[in-house]
Amino acid sequence: MRVFCVGLLLFSVTWAAPTFQPQTEKTKQSCVEEQRQEEKNKDNIGFHHLGKRINQELSSKENIVQERKKDLSLSEASENKGSSKSQNYFTNRQRLNKEYSISNKENTHNGLRMSIYPKSTGNKGFEDGDDAISKLHDQEEYGAALIRNNMQHIMGPVTAIKLLGEENKENTPRNVLNIIPASMNYAKAHSKDKKKPQRDSQAQKSPVKSKSTHRIQHNIDYLKHLSKVKKIPSDFEGSGYTDLQERGDNDISPFSGDGQPFKDIPGKGEATGPDLEGKDIQTGFAGPSEAESTHLDTKKPGYNEIPEREENGGNTIGTRDETAKEADAVDVSLVEGSNDIMGSTNFKELPGREGNRVDAGSQNAHQGKVEFHYPPAPSKEKRKEGSSDAAESTNYNEIPKNGKGSTRKGVDHSNRNQATLNEKQRFPSKGKSQGLPIPSRGLDNEIKNEMDSFNGPSHENIITHGRKYHYVPHRQNNSTRNKGMPQGKGSWGRQPHSNRRFSSRRRDDSSESSDSGSSSESDGD
């Protein structure tokens, strides 16, 4: 078996040998062909690269040649331009030198001519002219020397043009200065010296004038401010007397009986003072049964307010004492309706001279008019005494410290408690006008005011207070509203009726008349 197997293997090998030989030959031939193709490709690639290199070298050479040609053309052009420029420069130099020589000749001749006619300056003109004539000979000789020098430069060789130009540059300022005669320089310098002090004096005077004019203008404005004339109606729009009283700041206008002094009433429409932000407008009036009177402004305290509790721990008399310490305060009551102003004042205790006091019997004099009093400010001792007198004398006028918890036995007490309200009230005038604030000053001594019944729009009223006050506007009262106290008669308001006068009231009025007065005032408003 083994021999048989070995024989089969040998037979297969011998049979398969001729079949393998041609395949090997084919493979050899294919390899040779591939090698040849690769060699051809390499040769082609090499030729291609060589062609590219040759082409690149040729193109670079051509570019270099073109650039060289351009450079040559540019250099030639620049050389041509330079030659033309040099030629032009040379010709321009020649022209400039010629013109300069001619101008020098003309300048020298002009200088000689000008020296014959020198300028005179003021009073020293004759002296300057004599100096110029005495120096004329020297100037003529100098001008002739200049002409000789310029002629020598012109007749010189061409090679000396540059040197001549430099010398001309150096000589031009000297020639110009030398052409002008010295006498003229002296005259001009002297005239400038004369003009300078004049200008300096004017410059010194001008700020003085401006300061003086500024001060004069300030004084004029101040005098105008002091001498403003304010027109005040002599009555409150309805008594039939339409004349206007004009006054300055220090004049005294007519007075309506014995009542309180009033501030400016500009007629219709606008308020006199600029203090417009903190002013209250009182529009409603409460009856005796209501707790408080209405007001529109919530920024500052109202007109008829009674402080519940002061920050200092004191009552309204203390606040009156504080407001009385303001040196320029004014007590003003402005009524523009049929409201009633009344009260009683002890005229013997009022500050000021006796000649300026108002008697208690002269209540019916000057009805419906307004008077301004300007007394000297009372001293601090008088103020303290006045505040203590007010605390002692107004026993029925006292206001409790805690206003919310207080009650009154009758309407009479509520009527009597309006004394401190009357001095801190402001009243809006007709239209959009608002009354000025009323700080208490002298009324804190013994003001005892009451409100009486309101009989109608045509009821005649008389002012019963007389006093002298300083006129200083724009004061604000510091009172706050007492919500627990009835405001039946302390409220003030506007009445649209034509007849507006003031009447005095008495202390012993009944509570019924006060109720009717407060209701009629609230209805009229």
From Swiss-Prot:
Phosphorylated on serine residues in the ASARM motif (in vitro) by FAM20C; the phosphorylation is important for the inhibition of bone mineralization. Cleaved by CTSB/cathepsin B; the cleavage is blocked by metalloprotease PHEX. One of its GO terms (molecular function) is extracellular matrix structural constituent. It comes from the Eukaryota. Residues 25-46, 64-73, 292-312, 319-328 have a biased composition (Basic and acidic residues). Residues 1-17 form the signal peptide. Detected in urine (at protein level). Expressed by osteoblasts. Expressed by stem cells in dental pulp. Expressed by mesenchymal cells in dental papilla and dental pulp. Expressed in teeth, specifically in decidious dentin. Expressed in ondotoblasts. Expressed in salivary glands. Secreted from oncogenic hypophosphatemic tumors. A motif (Cell attachment site) lies at residues 247-249. InterPro entries: MEPE. Residues 75-95, 200-210 have a biased composition (Polar residues). Glycans are attached at residues 256, 477-478. Residues 24-95, 187-216, 237-525 are annotated as: Disordered. The acidic serine aspartate-rich MEPE-associated (ASARM) motif is sufficient when phosphorylated to inhibit bone mineralization by osteoblasts and cartilage mineralization by chondrocytes by binding hydroxyapatite crystals during the mineralization stage. It can also inhibit dentin mineralization. The dentonin region is sufficient to promote dental pulp stem cell proliferation. It can also stimulate bone formation, osteoblast differentiation, and activate integrin signaling pathways. Promotes renal phosphate excretion and inhibits intestinal phosphate absorption. Promotes bone mineralization by osteoblasts and cartilage mineralization by chondrocytes. Regulates the mineralization of the extracellular matrix of the craniofacial complex, such as teeth, bone and cartilage. Promotes dental pulp stem cell proliferation and differentiation. Interacts (via the ASARM motif) with PHEX; the interaction is zinc-dependent. This is Matrix extracellular phosphoglycoprotein.
